[in-house]
Amino acid sequence: MTVKTEAAKGTLTYSRMRGMVAILIAFMKQRRMGLNDFIQKIANNSYACKHPEVQSILKISQPQEPELMNANPSPPPSPSQQINLGPSSNPHAKPSDFHFLKVIGKGSFGKVLLARHKAEEVFYAVKVLQKKAILKKKEEKHIMSERNVLLKNVKHPFLVGLHFSFQTADKLYFVLDYINGGELFYHLQRERCFLEPRARFYAAEIASALGYLHSLNIVYRDLKPENILLDSQGHIVLTDFGLCKENIEHNSTTSTFCGTPEYLAPEVLHKQPYDRTVDWWCLGAVLYEMLYGLPPFYSRNTAEMYDNILNKPLQLKPNITNSARHLLEGLLQKDRTKRLGAKDDFMEIKSHVFFSLINWDDLINKKITPPFNPNVSGPNDLRHFDPEFTEEPVPNSIGKSPDSVLVTASVKEAAEAFLGFSYAPPTDSFL
């Protein structure tokens, strides 16, 4: 197979191919790093710290949202501040209600497991988080916010739904929809990029999900291929709402420095107040990656990548349509006030000529056949999950419901920090 690049129009040499592979491997590894770990790493690099943009970023002023920046957390919310969880007579779920079958994902605070409910014989994805790790990084308010956002997702087909949440003395459990078509990141790794019709379909479903969150005054803030799943039919499902910010109305802003390096909008890097349009920048970055194989301003040198995001003009190769080009230019506009979506939010995206072939009513009702079918044979088909996860043994402690727990100061602290976490749906819910 002949591969051509902008720099060399002929067949790639072995040395050039090795260089490309090295770039992609470095890119994948870096993508798996948390933002906090990345900032710590760059802060310890004396050469990187000399770069003016890095110096600017590291001099972060006092954030308005302390839970994401390792400041002292606010006192835990009182029961009256919690979302109404329905009739208190509903029984709480417990770990022993499930058969935990496979590890299918990992994160900063725990694991995601495929589990089958013993009584219902239904498969779920159960996100199990360690309270000790959450409290150590002072992220308890952040976790409660994720749970609150999940409770609002039940009415949209392209957002993962929460069925139960409960806790033991040392762990939190999110019982979620089980989605086994694989991460968009996984499919991009295998295929490198997508044809425009396929990219348009995914972008439309993603935009629909973001528009719904915005209608609830929620900004997603962490759109990236790792957080976009495909269901068994090939429709997208957004997951991981840990960086969502609630109560952001149309003209409201927030200022926390958070997100994933490759997808940070210029206003976030500048430490300026930002609004819902940060999600439309991320949509542009993901669409660009689907069409070209890498994020728009990517560099192995993170300081250089940040400088590209802030200062480098958007460069688009000629192998896309004019409508795709126009959409990318609108979404990846560095001035958020001029960005597509700044005035009428999702309606501007929806009415763009790039999506003129999309029937939005059919889209939301899943009447449009996805351009790619993951071809999973059933819930036990794990072909689209990373073997790094699925080959890992399931920890014995995850499925146990201890009859008694030694009450220590740390256990009491955890109980207070996650007050109101447990959730059982009311009888008229989506279950």
Curated annotation (Swiss-Prot):
* Gene Ontology biological process: apoptotic process; cellular response to aldosterone; DNA damage response; intracellular signal transduction; long-term memory; neuron projection morphogenesis; positive regulation of transporter activity; protein phosphorylation
**Active site per the UniProt annotation:** D222
* EC top class named in words: transferase
Expression tissues = Expressed in most tissues with highest levels in the pancreas, followed by placenta, kidney and lung. Isoform 2 is strongly expressed in brain and pancreas, weaker in heart, placenta, lung, liver and skeletal muscle.
* Induction notes from the record: Induced by a very large spectrum of stimuli distinct from glucocorticoids and serum. These include aldosterone, cell shrinkage, cell swelling, TGF-beta, ischemic injury of the brain, neuronal excitotoxicity memory consolidation, chronic viral hepatitis, DNA-damaging agents, vitamin D3 psychophysiological stress, iron, glucose, EDN1, CSF2, fibroblast growth factor, platelet-derived growth factor, phorbolesters, follicle-stimulating hormone, sorbitol, heat shock, oxidative stress, UV irradiation, and p53/TP53.
Chain positions with Phosphoserine modification:
S74, S78, S397, S401, S422
Q: Where is this motif: Nuclear localization signal?
A: 131-141
Q: Where in the cell is it found?
A: Cytoplasm; Nucleus; Endoplasmic reticulum membrane; Cell membrane
The Protein kinase domain sits at 98-355
- What parts of the sequence cross the membrane? none
Regarding activators and inhibitors, the annotation says: Two specific sites, one in the kinase domain (Thr-256) and the other in the C-terminal regulatory region (Ser-422), need to be phosphorylated for its full activation. Phosphorylation at Ser-397 and Ser-401 are also essential for its activity. Activated by WNK1, WNK2, WNK3 and WNK4; which promote phosphorylation by mTORC2.
Q: Which family does it belong to?
A: Belongs to the protein kinase superfamily. AGC Ser/Thr protein kinase family.
Please describe what this protein does.
Answer: Serine/threonine-protein kinase which is involved in the regulation of a wide variety of ion channels, membrane transporters, cellular enzymes, transcription factors, neuronal excitability, cell growth, proliferation, survival, migration and apoptosis. Plays an important role in cellular stress response.
Copy the domain comment: Isoform 2 subcellular localization at the cell membrane and resistance to proteasomal degradation is mediated by the sequences within the first 120 amino acids.
**Name of the molecule in the record:** Serine/threonine-protein kinase Sgk1
| Species annotation | Homo sapiens
Q: What is the lineage of its organism?
A: Eukaryota, Metazoa, Chordata, Craniata, Vertebrata
Name the gene that codes for it: SGK1
